[in-house]
Every structure is written in structure tokens, then in C-alpha cells.
Amino acid sequence: MIKIDVKIIDPRMADQLPAYATPGSAGLDLRACLDAPLTLLPNAWQLVPTGIAIYLKDPKFAAMILPRSGLGHKHGIVLGNLVGLIDSDYQGQLMVSAWNRSDVAFTIEPMERIAQLVIVPVLQAQFNVVSEFPASARGEGGYGSTGKG
């Protein structure tokens, strides 16, 4: 387990830090650091503060903000940017772009768990320009080229 620096921006988050729900959880739950309930109308989106900032420091790591499966499946609440990528050198408050893709209004309550944070390894690439690639079984076959199902 790696240690990550966290800055508490809103004092209410001091005892609400991201946590793994179970020993096998990959994602840490992020909470909506709101002063009042926030109602998202159908097809509306809003940046929701989490009340914390993290600093990964090491460029071998990044964080991803992902939707909570229950909110997406049961209520249509997903991320407006689909995935939030947090670079290792970012130090600002974590924000969740909440998007209501359903046809009914949804209310986010203060301190409700609204997304999850997953820490991932990163390999930075350096491009090597070539005029041709060596042959492979797939070649330039694109969408659907490997068959159905």
C-alpha cells in the first residue's frame, strides 16, 4: 500500500476521508462536500466538490475518478467527463463532474458517496518514429475486424 498526501480543504472532511468499503475494494469512496442538497435535473451536470486535495508526487502513479456503479445503474448518475484523470503533479481540490443522464431529477445529499478514486500505475512512453511496422496477425484491421462477440 502506498501513502498519499491529502489536504483537507473543508473541515467537515476530517473524519470523512476516502476509504475502501471492503478489504477487496479497488476504489476509495469520494463524498459530495456540499452545504445543502443538490438536485440535478434530467440531463444536467454539475461540478461537485469533495473537500479534499491529494498530491501523488510520483509520476509513476495517477488517480482516476470513476462513477459508483449503483448510482449509474439505478439512478443514471455518471461522470460528465466519463473518467476523471488526476495527474501526479495536480494539487487542487478533487471535483466530481456529476451528470444526470436519466429522465428524472436526482438529489445528491451532503456527504453522500458519489464517486470512487482508484490509484493506478503509469508508464510514460517515448515515441519512436518508424516508416513501417513489422507484420502482425491483425495488421490494420479496425473496429469489428476480429469477429463478433
Swiss-Prot record:
Keywords: Hydrolase, Magnesium, Metal-binding, Nucleotide metabolism. Pathway: Pyrimidine metabolism; dUMP biosynthesis; dUMP from dCTP (dUTP route): step 2/2. Its EC number is 3.6.1.23. It catalyses: dUTP + H2O = dUMP + diphosphate + H(+). One of its GO terms (molecular function) is magnesium ion binding. Coiled coil: none annotated. Its cofactor is Mg(2+). Substrate binds at R68, S69, G70, N81, L85, I86, D87, M95. Belongs to the dUTPase family. This enzyme is involved in nucleotide metabolism: it produces dUMP, the immediate precursor of thymidine nucleotides and it decreases the intracellular concentration of dUTP so that uracil cannot be incorporated into DNA. This is Deoxyuridine 5'-triphosphate nucleotidohydrolase. It comes from Albidiferax ferrireducens (strain ATCC BAA-621 / DSM 15236 / T118) (Rhodoferax ferrireducens). The lineage of its organism: Bacteria, Pseudomonadati, Pseudomonadota, Betaproteobacteria, Burkholderiales.
